[in-house]
């Protein structure tokens, strides 16, 4: 029979003896049940086994160490696997560790001391236990304080475990912090990855309630992870970091002088302790191997993380201290910014691809239209050639006589028309020469009138002085007379120019009427060029041909403190994590800029608003122009946001509260996009500050848009 079979037989016999007695063999019996029962039954029977120590005799000062070690063995036993696993561990070669190795660990001394006191303990137990299994109270006189010592031993065991934890933190904090940093880094990396996914797929959408729930759930999950980690590592899980320190602390506690207790220890109990200690040492070796492997894996992960940080451009962290909170936030911001840049780049590529596809479609459509038009032109040219060939054949089929007669008649008619035109041109030339002679005589007539006035002026002065005696008050100065003469001269020249233009227009009208009567319909090439030139000139003159003194590039500006509040749109142009950062809106400056296209306008709340403009120069206002986009360019073919009734006020200075009303006008939404309104006042003062006050619009309930506002007039100097 092997030694292992003998030990199992001895434990079975000890268990049977312990079940029939209630005295001194209770300790051995309870200890044997720890290895016969399952771990679950061991935990349930732990309290009862400890209570059975109460009738034990006084074992001397070393009993505390034994009780503490026994309690610690019970605690370690609760973490052991079932009996099959223990037998496998027992059969391993590592369980047969030499006593010298255990002495190096700090446990060999206690084992040898227990081995030396084996005979004494057996004899003492035989003395205390009776053959019938019962014992007398007289045998246990002086042993009433065992319960107090067992409670103190449990407290001492808890203190020893706490001391081992503190000793591990004090001696090797690097490993503890590396493990904690690895666990926190992995958790944080997963959280940042989840946050990036939330930013892309959830937070960019406008789910306010879901976003609030996720922001609440994120710290809750973090708190749950921290709580689980604290529960997992306290109090026994922390022993897995450095089991050698825990065993050293327990061995140090067990090396106290225990001569009296060793005399009472039984042989089966000692062998059970030896077996448990050997298994504990084997587990310690395996845990140390696992810790070494875990440390190497952690170092590999740390090196990989550092390479990743260097690759991503993040500043490297020296040593093994880990990343701080600010560095982690910086890494998170870097990841988010890179993700955002990648999304923007993808959006730009998709937009460019879509625009390219639309351009390709437009090119294809344009090419198709061009091909269709070319086919139509070719078809029309072929039809024309066929018609010409038909006319040629018809003309060749006509007789020569009929052709000559018709040709002679047509030539006569054309000669008559040409003669009439020559006569009309001669009459027109005569009229033009007469008008030119009259225009040429005008300076002579003006000079004659001037000479006559100058010749008669002294006589008039003498007559005026001779009349009434002291009438010097009514004298005219020379400057006033010259001003009146210049005014008379300008009036005469203006009248002559009007007469000349009127005569030219009458001649052109009569000529066109004559040509229409004679059957000549159409315009000449010179007239077409003249019309096109006039149209291009009018377009180059800002489409109205009037100087704009409210142009921002010319020096005008908007007094923003005296304008209505700008209407803000509800759609954010830029947002971060679903939070709007910037809304798109135009300032009142846009009404002074010539860039007019749909949407580029200044909008204010409601149908009523105002804007005050400082002109580029002090002028005498003559007209204002209001411009809006046409209905054809509007997406819904309506311009209900256009102003309808408005008024113009003039201010002498910027700080003036109420201005002078210059006029009230109405913008027609069915008219031209650019509408000019002239002031009706015969005399107008000079102003440099003008207010545009919108009274109503064309029906939009939320806002009113102004695209461009112009002011025309004459300079004050």
From Swiss-Prot:
Q: How does it assemble?
A: Core component of the LINC complex which is composed of inner nuclear membrane SUN domain-containing proteins coupled to outer nuclear membrane KASH domain-containing nesprins. SUN and KASH domain-containing proteins seem to bind each other promiscuously; however, differentially expression of LINC complex constituents is giving rise to specific assemblies. At least SUN1/2-containing core LINC complexes are proposed to be hexameric composed of three protomers of each KASH and SUN domain-containing protein.
List the residue ranges forming a coiled coil, or say none.
Answer: 273-296, 348-440, 475-506
In the UniProt record, the gene name given for this protein reads SUN2
Does the keyword field hold Zinc? no
Q: What is this protein called?
A: SUN domain-containing protein 2
Primary location recorded for the protein, binned into one broad class = nucleus
Pull the Perinuclear space topological domain ranges from the record.
Answer: 234-717
Give the Phosphoserine positions (modified residues).
Answer: 12, 38, 54, 110, 113, 116, 136
| Keyword RNA-binding tagged | no
Q: Which Pfam families match?
A: HTH_SUN2, Sad1_UNC
Q: State any GO CC term.
A: meiotic nuclear membrane microtubule tethering complex
Which species is the source of this protein? Answer: Homo sapiens
Function comment? As a component of the LINC (LInker of Nucleoskeleton and Cytoskeleton) complex, involved in the connection between the nuclear lamina and the cytoskeleton. The nucleocytoplasmic interactions established by the LINC complex play an important role in the transmission of mechanical forces across the nuclear envelope and in nuclear movement and positioning. Specifically, SYNE2 and SUN2 assemble in arrays of transmembrane actin-associated nuclear (TAN) lines which are bound to F-actin cables and couple the nucleus to retrograde actin flow during actin-dependent nuclear movement.
The reported effect of residue 703 to E is:
Decreases interaction with SYNE2. Disrupts interaction with SYNE2
Q: What CDD domains does UniProt report for this protein, alphabetically?
A: SUN2_cc1
